Amino acid sequence: MMDLKVDEEEVDSGQPVSIQAFASSSTLHGISHIFSYERLSLKRVVWALCFMGSLALLALVCTNRIQYYFLYPHVTKLDEVAATRLTFPAVTFCNLNEFRFSRVTKNDLYHAGELLALLNNRYEIPDTQTADEKQLEILQDKANFRNFKPKPFNMLEFYDRAGHDIREMLLSCFFRGEQCSPEDFKVVFTRYGKCYTFNAGQDGKPRLITMKGGTGNGLEIMLDIQQDEYLPVWGETDETSFEAGIKVQIHSQDEPPLIDQLGFGVAPGFQTFVSCQEQRLIYLPPPWGDCKATTGDSEFYDTYSITACRIDCETRYLVENCNCRMVHMPGDAPYCTPEQYKECADPALDFLVEKDNEYCVCEMPCNVTRYGKELSMVKIPSKASAKYLAKKYNKSEQYIGENILVLDIFFEALNYETIEQKKAYEVAGLLGDIGGQMGLFIGASILTVLELFDYAYEVIKHRLCRRGKCRKNHKRNNTDKGVALSMDDVKRHNPCESLRGHPAGMTYAANILPHHPARGTFEDFTC
């Protein structure tokens, strides 16, 4: 049996349109004049040069925009926001004299006399020429260490016991016109010793708020700084103070006081008015800014702040260099002894604060609340009120003038200022600039770019198919792919025999043409 087959292997006919046809229908401006069916002419050359120049300018501008984006620029937005109520800040103050003279015992003098510059290293009073006779007599009695058996000494207990007591210092206290008491102040230790914080927001007490601005709507306290309790100054040490008055810091409840570096002084004999404005600062994290976005790095404080970071860093520095910590420092390291204070802790901390700029590098938190201040003051007491105040507090007029001060802290207005860093150039701006430049120089859009990619894909696919990567075998069917016939089929449908043996009387002309109506198609094919 012999089969006749017509097999054909053909290439898928996916040929893309010509570049001229694509250019004529593309939304990309200018290329229809470059790729045309006309022969090369000056017009086409000029269009090509203009198009390439526009592409070059577009690339230049887009490169500039992309470089600017990766500079991560930012702008600062300043705004004032009115409020119906504001949280009153924490107010911390310290007497500039760390220890009360009357509270220094013989045991204190034995252990810390040299630290306080009251004794020399031989336990002797160094200079008696400038001493007050009454103080000198008391000090000589305390400095007599014959048959004295020293007892254990603890710096924390000494600071707490010998520091100024709020119950003796506070003569009057009002907040928003309502009386307050020493119980509203929380003890806090700083480098100035025993200090007090009003509105600390701790120990279960809520943070106080104010509903109005101006004097009378904040905190007003009258204090006695007790200059007669100041330690006599016969020499200079890190614990010696030449000033009289208090140091004050206004700060957020979320950060500890760093009053020795950030506080301002208030002098006796004056009423000091402090007008505040709350400022909320919002910084950007890298790469747009330098703020620290993460919190919780400190093992001593829950909320990250620059002051918390500095205290934490100073504590680690002293523990590493002196194997102890100062009274105001957090942690569980042992407190420094008076000898360690004098020989190591005070010099090391002074060096760290004033000269070392590399050990304690504290990043700015991304959200900061601070308080701008404006100070003004008036003399107190007046001549008219001096006698009244002296009688009221059972003191002399001279004592009132040398020891009494009034501190009035209030909000200037019931609003706050926001200082916010914002991204100056974001992805949306970059895309908008690039899209605008594309439209300006070449009249293109994102869809135009998709057109180009689609045409490039079709061209690449066609070229790959021409190399034999897309060939397929196909069999022709009876209608359009050809028919495979066996010899039996040919014999059964043999028209030639019928032509040779046609019935009698049926004749065909010798000159009959193929496809004549008298003959069939199949007969034409087989014969």
UniProtKB/Swiss-Prot annotation:
Changing residue 346 to N: Loss of pH-gated channel activity. InterPro entries: ENaC, ENaC_chordates, ENaC_CS. GO terms for cellular component: dendrite; plasma membrane; postsynaptic membrane. It catalyses: Na(+)(in) = Na(+)(out); Li(+)(in) = Li(+)(out); K(+)(in) = K(+)(out); Ca(2+)(in) = Ca(2+)(out). The record marks 356 as: Involved in proton-dependent gating. It is found in: Cell membrane; Postsynaptic cell membrane; Cell projection, Dendrite. Glycans are attached at residues 367, 394. Residues 72-424 are extracellular. A motif (GAS motif) lies at residues 443-445. Gene3D superfamilies: acid-sensing ion channel 1 domain, Acid-sensing ion channel domain, YojJ-like. One of its GO terms (biological process) is sodium ion transmembrane transport. It is a multi-pass membrane protein. Pfam families: ASC. Disulfide bonds join 94-195, 173-180, 291-366, 309-362, 313-360, 322-344, 324-336. This is Acid-sensing ion channel 1.
